Amino acid sequence: MNLGLNVKEIERYDLVILLMAVALTCFGVVMVYSASSVMATKKFHDGFYFLKRQGVYALLGFGVMAVAMRIDYRTWREYAVPILLGCLFLLFLVFIPGIGGAAKGASRWIRLPGFNFQPSELTKIALIVYMAYSLDKKQDKVKFFSTGFLPYMVLLSVVLLILLKQHDLGAALTMGLVAIIMLFAAGTRPRYIIAMGMMALPILYFLVMNVDYRRRRILAYLNPWEDPTDTGFQIIQSWLAFGNGGVLGQGLGEGKQKMFYLPEAHTDFILSVTGEELGLIGVTVIAAMFLMLVLRGVRVALMAQEPFGRFLAFGIATLLGIQSFVNMAVVTGLLPTKGLALPFISYGGSSLIVTLFAVGILLNISTRLKGAP
């Protein structure tokens, strides 16, 4: 397979999606350096520590995206089942001593030389590919409970139980939402989804309120000022960052909250640093870029030539939309903390590489739209 791309070949792809993905990734590398340099200097005696790693992740991600762009998306339909089974196997590997890695009480990573891989990130794409394959196969049968709803709920329950065992409620909720939205778009009867939601609410309440750190997050979300030095500390510092930034920002690299005030400044709360340094204008531009990317993804889904491509593109666009919206809502205090990275921008190799891989698939679908030669 020739991976070289000439100008005419590039023009076949949705250039808006391509440009948004590249621009957000490059911006993310810059912001990771800005948000992490002080901490990296103190912890590793190298202010460029996270910048160098994120730069490598970005290059790897661009390479993976370039490969995915050239692979006919219909190829993934043939391997949907083994890919999903492989990802489920990887999810189990994190529990094996010596292979799995833990941090802050959560077992979510597989230790690789120089790199910790988070299989839940790849499982998100595997689940979307499988659901697109299955929904395409079932067609009108998706309207029936026994064939078009129950099997997906069983599969989803298995995946979510594994993720909850890893203490990864954020990934579990994300996958659940993406799956439900895909089912709704495919024609599943709304009453099934509503009934499932009503049954899930008490379970979700138990999962949150029965676990101390999750319960404290909810209480901090409702009233962070009740405990401003502990559970409410992170969101208060995030608000201070946005407040310091105002409309125009303090200037790139000039933020103060990243100086050990704001926890997770270069990961989950990197948008807060962006708000402090680039202001409301900078955050608005980033939000607009995400919105444009998601809308173009939905456009690709609507114009796809056949159902598998339609469901696959819609699932990827939905995933990008949910993850970016939830992260932005968390850092502004609209939602309780979830531990979800901001796609393309937050520090992290697994998230960035898998996200660019998904964009590559979306770009390939964009070359095979209705009316295209």
Swiss-Prot record:
Pathway: Cell wall biogenesis; peptidoglycan biosynthesis. Its EC number is 2.4.99.28. GO terms for cellular component: cell division site; plasma membrane. It catalyses: [GlcNAc-(1->4)-Mur2Ac(oyl-L-Ala-gamma-D-Glu-L-Lys-D-Ala-D-Ala)](n)-di-trans,octa-cis-undecaprenyl diphosphate + beta-D-GlcNAc-(1->4)-Mur2Ac(oyl-L-Ala-gamma-D-Glu-L-Lys-D-Ala-D-Ala)-di-trans,octa-cis-undecaprenyl diphosphate = [GlcNAc-(1->4)-Mur2Ac(oyl-L-Ala-gamma-D-Glu-L-Lys-D-Ala-D-Ala)](n+1)-di-trans,octa-cis-undecaprenyl diphosphate + di-trans,octa-cis-undecaprenyl diphosphate + H(+). The chain crosses the membrane at residues 15-35, 48-68, 80-100, 144-164, 168-188, 192-212, 278-298, 311-331, 342-362. It holds the Pfam family FTSW_RODA_SPOVE. Keywords: Cell cycle, Cell division, Cell inner membrane, Cell membrane, Cell shape, Cell wall biogenesis/degradation, Glycosyltransferase, Membrane, Peptidoglycan synthesis, Transferase, Transmembrane, Transmembrane helix. It is found in: Cell inner membrane. It is a multi-pass membrane protein. GO terms for molecular function: lipid-linked peptidoglycan transporter activity; peptidoglycan glycosyltransferase activity. It comes from the Bacteria. GO terms for biological process: cell division; cell wall organization; peptidoglycan biosynthetic process; regulation of cell shape. Peptidoglycan polymerase that is essential for cell division. Belongs to the SEDS family. FtsW subfamily. This is Probable peptidoglycan glycosyltransferase FtsW.
